Amino acid sequence: MNPIRSVKEEFCEIVANGLGISKDVIFKTLEYPPREELGDISLPLPSLKLNVRTEVTFSHGKLIKEVRKTGIYVNAFVDEKELFKLLFTEMQDDYGVEKTENPKRIVVEHTSANPIHPLHIGHLRNSILGDTISRMLKIRGHDVNRRFYVNDAGRQVAILTLGYILLGEPEPSPKVDHWFGLIYSITNVIIEIRELKEELKKDLDPDTYKDKINRLDELVATAQSLRERNPEFFDKLADAINSIPDVESEIQKIIKSYEKGDDPKIKQIVRKIVNLNLDGFRESLDKLEISFDVYDYESELLWSGMVDEILSKAFQIAKDYKGTKALELEDINEKIKEILNIPKGLKLPPLVLTRSDGTSLYTTRDIAYTVKKFSDFKADTVINVIAEQQSIPQMQLRASLYLLGYERLAQNLVHYSYGMVNLQGMRMSGRLGRFISLDDVIEKVSEVAKKKIEEKSGDITNLRDIVNSAIRYAILSVASNKPVTFNINNIVDFEQNSGPYLQYTYARAYNILAKNQDEIKLTDADLSDLIGDKRRLLLLIARFPETFNKAIDELRPEDLIDFLRRTADVFNRWYNFERVLQEPDYRKRITRLFIVKGIERVLYNGLNALGIKPLSKM
């Protein structure tokens, strides 16, 4: 059911009859006027390349009560009485949800954080965006597969493994990802200090020497801070690392051994570390109702031979590049670039296939993993939720797939890009253990939310759902291509522009209906009462399916958030000035109850799609 589509179709028919133009052409150019006094639907005549001075008389219809030509626009006014009858004659519980006529099998890969320390606020946006678009696509009728890429064969995991072995493989303590994160940060900072001290022994120019001294001072300060958190671990690791003649050689041994899978002991230790960290991730993400269908291990790609297969194909068309092999991407045809969503005129750098020692790079593994995602799920589309800093590597990936003969995959691989998350007054570095973890964020938001709930004598049993809504709204309300500044004190506001505000508004609508004792019959409604904010709410309810499905199809949850917020604002303004259950006029009361019913459905289905739980009490 899509009431506003019915309105638009009738308007198109009226205008088509008046101007002698195809209804389909008109439909595509319709707009909503910036001010309600201008009309409810608008057609800009210049978009049809018509003479704007042409005088035409338009008729009206069942849903359209008046059509006016104002300047270069033809504006229509909806008959609110007929719209009310159309809307509430057919409204079902799933109002707004329209299953797509073209269902697809879609893989959404998101989060995919290195399993070396807890998830932090930098991962938060990725996780929430990935989970939300997965939810929205499922509601639309697509078959969605959520995947997490486990980067267990990289240098950072090798550094953590070295530290854990040097400590004697102690039993982890809760919360396990925080515990391993500390070991990783300590190990890494000790190695960096040692390497920097060696560099300072070289003959350096004054500026370079000064920069390295400043960097050393920063690392030493970080080391002191880390030592305060666990002096025993720090001192033991410092002694062990500084007694190793060549630390880099030890790290490379772990990397190469694990890549080959030929040392059962290394294999067992790395998998233990990685899987325990993933348990920590799952525990954190569960607080936000986020989960995955599949965890794909990078090591499995290597051991299965998939990466070697890709390399074998790539070497056939690769060129020599700085002592190794690379795919030349600079001169790709502009038509192919357009197909692959690569900006015109952009010269992509070569995609290097291997290190100088012949071992594969993450770029080559990404090609193999993309093939796996498509083949495992028989996917029509794969969506990679990855930060905007990875735009060039993602373009290289699509271009490389195309050159290697995977044209369909390249054309259906989507980079869902997003800007970074900034935490006011905090500079983050995962390597140095300087970050706000996802658990810290949830805890801090919980503290603020709990205080506000208690101030209102609210229901504390809903705390987890309120925290989830506050965090999700803060992330989703900003367009993905813009940065988010995360202010914990501002995201829990029951009065305006927040997840809890939308939940509070839903609870208000729900409880009006729950307390009602009247039988709500359409024939009893007073349609003359559809004025002011009630008319505005009626139009918003009618527009919900269009906004809802467009936001899903365009992967723009921020548009749905904005619509729900505007709807909640109008509803609360109306309810603060006009009673519903206390209205003595029975027919007016019925009309208002229908409006509340529509708002309750809009908020319920909209919030549910965003992963925000609609609450019946706050």
From Swiss-Prot:
EC number: 6.1.1.19
Coiled coil stretches, renumbered: none
Catalytic activity: tRNA(Arg) + L-arginine + ATP = L-arginyl-tRNA(Arg) + AMP + diphosphate
EC supergroup of this enzyme: ligase
Location(s) in or outside the cell: Cytoplasm
GO molecular function, one term: arginine-tRNA ligase activity
NCBIfam families, per the entry: argS, PRK01611.3-3
HAMAP family: Arg_tRNA_synth
UniProt protein name: Arginine--tRNA ligase
Species whose genome carries this gene: Sulfolobus acidocaldarius (strain ATCC 33909 / DSM 639 / JCM 8929 / NBRC 15157 / NCIMB 11770)
